[in-house]
């Protein structure tokens, strides 16, 4: 007999589905081990078992960033205590990018992402109904897994589905929204954007409008230049006239740029660096170690961590050289596929408020952009230049 379910899963792609689920899974632990690392180890094991080779010469800007990180870490290890586990994890992250992206099929990935989007939006709807009934909601959990860190609020009036916080949900949705815009599936993109508005994530709301603006800027057809601004106006109207979005709008209006820790703490810490350190970074392995040494005393600690946005954290730990290589890794993707402009623009802007850095979220985004960019390049939808 024909295995119908097997054929259906095959059309999606098991590897692609697992990859699409990574942003959800990496927020949990399995038996005390963080899935943010385990998911990439599992994918590497699958690749090695299948006999695929790692293509280190595939995307040179990323390879240069990886080499700089390794040399920099070795030098810092001679002067400060380096977390060995974190160092091994970072090596695995870089290996995962080089190994995974050549194996993913864009069509199967698109289907897998759409299915995961439907699942997380269903979770969002469930939480929203719970808020309507009880006035608050619990974070959704996955049976057999534990949350990797305690949430600041066990109960919340802001839904986030299976993610740790609304900002994490918004970060995940950036990629499907970008893909929907690239495919000109405007209705699907609007649905995804509205789901981000449901979370009341300030970063998510701002980023969605940035992506729409960047995508409109790229359009040459007069119809698109008229339709997209109308959609943006409609979204703004929805934000201001529907009570379901009230929390997000209030949060956006009440955000004090001058006092918000997420926006100001990084600038303060970097301001305590000495002249020569701006080139290659400070001789400390983390912002926490740097601040605890007495170099920056007026900071707020989150356990054994100091929150700093990606932009400032890169300057602190890796200097302007590291920041330059990081940005070139993103900018050079535009040579492969100009249609990635809205997504890359959003990622660069959120560097001032988000903490993606070189984490597992960076791995996920890079793999996605390389898969999409390479496919569009091959089909001559984007630039005809291939990876060098």
Regions found by a protein language model. Give the residues of each.
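Long extracytoplasmic/lumenal interhelical loops at the membrane interface
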Residues: 251-318
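Hydrophobic transmembrane alpha-helices and their immediate junctions
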Residues: 3, 212-217, 222-227, 314-350
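Aromatic-anchored transmembrane helix interface
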Residues: 61-70, 80-103
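Transmembrane signal-anchor hairpin modules in multi-pass inner-membrane enzymes, especially those
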Residues: 1-71, 376-388
């Amino acid at each position: 007999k024909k295995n119908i379910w097997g054929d259906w899963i095959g059309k999606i792609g098991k590897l692609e589905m697992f990859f699409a689920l990574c942003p959800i899974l990496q927020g949990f632990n399995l038996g005390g081990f963080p899935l943010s690392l385990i998911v990439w180890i599992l994918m590497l094991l699958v690749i090695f078992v299948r006999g695929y080779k790692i293509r280190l010469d595939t995307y040179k800007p990323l390879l240069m960033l990886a080499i700089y990180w390794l040399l920099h870490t070795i030098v810092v290890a001679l002067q400060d205590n380096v977390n060995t586990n974190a160092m091994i994890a970072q090596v695995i992250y870089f290996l995962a990018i080089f190994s995974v992206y050549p194996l993913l099929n864009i069509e199967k990935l698109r289907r897998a992402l759409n299915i995961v989007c439907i699942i997380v939006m269903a979770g969002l709807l469930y939480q929203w109904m719970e808020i309507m009934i009880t006035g608050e909601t619990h974070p959704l959990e996955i049976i057999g897994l534990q949350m990797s860190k305690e949430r600041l609020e066990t109960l919340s009036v802001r839904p986030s589905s299976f993610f740790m916080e609304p900002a994490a949900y918004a970060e995940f949705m950036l990629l499907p929204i970008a893909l929907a815009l690239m495919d000109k599936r405007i209705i699907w993109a609007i649905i995804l954007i509205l789901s981000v508005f449901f979370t009341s994530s300030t970063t998510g709301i701002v980023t969605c409008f940035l992506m729409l603006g960047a995508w409109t800027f790229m359009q040459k057809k007069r119809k698109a230049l008229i339709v997209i601004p109308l959609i943006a106006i409609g979204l703004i109207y929805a934000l201001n006239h529907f009570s379901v979005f009230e929390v997000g709008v209030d949060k956006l209006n009440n955000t004090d740029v001058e006092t918000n820790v997420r926006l100001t703490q990084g600038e303060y810490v970097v301001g305590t660096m000495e002249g020569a350190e701006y080139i290659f970074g400070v001789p400390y392995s983390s912002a926490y170690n740097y601040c605890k040494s007495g170099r920056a005393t007026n900071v707020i600690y989150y356990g054994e961590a100091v929150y700093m946005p990606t932009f400032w954290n890169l300057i602190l730990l890796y200097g302007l050289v590291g920041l330059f290589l990081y940005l070139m890794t993103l900018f050079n993707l535009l040579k492969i596929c100009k249609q990635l402009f809205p997504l890359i623009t959003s990622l660069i802007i959120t560097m001032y408020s988000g903490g993606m850095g070189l984490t597992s979220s960076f791995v996920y985004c890079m793999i996605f952009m390389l898969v999409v960019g390479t496919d569009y390049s091959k089909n001559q939808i984007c630039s005809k230049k291939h990876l060098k």
